[in-house]
């Protein structure tokens, strides 16, 4: 919205700054951060009054989780409000890619909110029906994939870009939209599975998002794209503003989610943020790189898949408990120890993912 102030510029004054993505990204970051700081406590107090008993704790979970009883959930609302306000104020609203990612984020947030609401009202860990969640998420992801394919340059529409290889594309044809559904749904649910300890999910999400802000800026700039040998996707640089707002809102949330958490993100936040990462990967044509940058989420999701399949086949478990962060809890690792080590892993994987920009 504030980008339109450039119409008041004569080319050398303050209003000219609004032309620059980096300036507006900084504005979006601080807007979202301050929103999170100032409105975090009032939101937590409101959630505590409305939810009374807070998020239900599983009886079969790690014993130390029983001390978290009464902690309110749906804290993802704080991140979502902050990033939405930051994006609407500072991003170019005539950019279709921004709207795709923002609407995917809010769509998955709505699914998560309904799920959290069901859990809180029934005081049971089983919320919204899995089939309903899957169906709505599939529709949102399919619409996003189709919109991205329509907006992409003709030479890239329906194509899958391969990292490490210059100008390597695989034409997916009619399989492109189903593939984008897999990416977006997979990312949303993987982040959702990771959100099981105080502060565990939000930092890796911000790290992955920061990595994709660099990717979006590079592939959206013809000079950088040509230098790095990546595919040029005009307009994606504007997603750096969205990501900056996400990180600002995420930090504001982490202020209250740091151990011991005063509020949980809930499915409201985890599904939304995962969906956002998936949508950004699709828009920037770096879907495979997301599996590297977000490798921590992949491992968490795979641990659940392996556990379920192995148990159905043998009646035994591979892990003491899945997702894998609970396995380490059962082995005696402290919560802070697990969280910080997973943050370190997320940072290392993000750096490896960014290296794919040049290694080709």
Swiss-Prot record:
Transmembrane segments: 20-40, 71-91, 93-113, 134-154, 168-188, 199-219, 239-259, 263-283, 288-308, 337-357
Localization (cell): Cell inner membrane
Top enzyme category: transferase
Molecular function as annotated in GO: metal ion binding; phospho-N-acetylmuramoyl-pentapeptide-transferase activity; UDP-N-acetylmuramoyl-L-alanyl-D-glutamyl-meso-2,6-diaminopimelyl-D-alanyl-D-alanine:undecaprenyl-phosphate transferase activity
GO biological process: cell division; cell wall organization; peptidoglycan biosynthetic process; regulation of cell shape
Alphabetized UniProt keyword annotations: Cell cycle, Cell division, Cell inner membrane, Cell membrane, Cell shape, Cell wall biogenesis/degradation, Magnesium, Membrane, Metal-binding, Peptidoglycan synthesis, Transferase, Transmembrane, Transmembrane helix
EC numbers, comma separated: 2.7.8.13
Protein family (similarity comment): Belongs to the glycosyltransferase 4 family. MraY subfamily.
Biological role stated in the UniProt entry: Catalyzes the initial step of the lipid cycle reactions in the biosynthesis of the cell wall peptidoglycan: transfers peptidoglycan precursor phospho-MurNAc-pentapeptide from UDP-MurNAc-pentapeptide onto the lipid carrier undecaprenyl phosphate, yielding undecaprenyl-pyrophosphoryl-MurNAc-pentapeptide, known as lipid I.
This protein's name: Phospho-N-acetylmuramoyl-pentapeptide-transferase
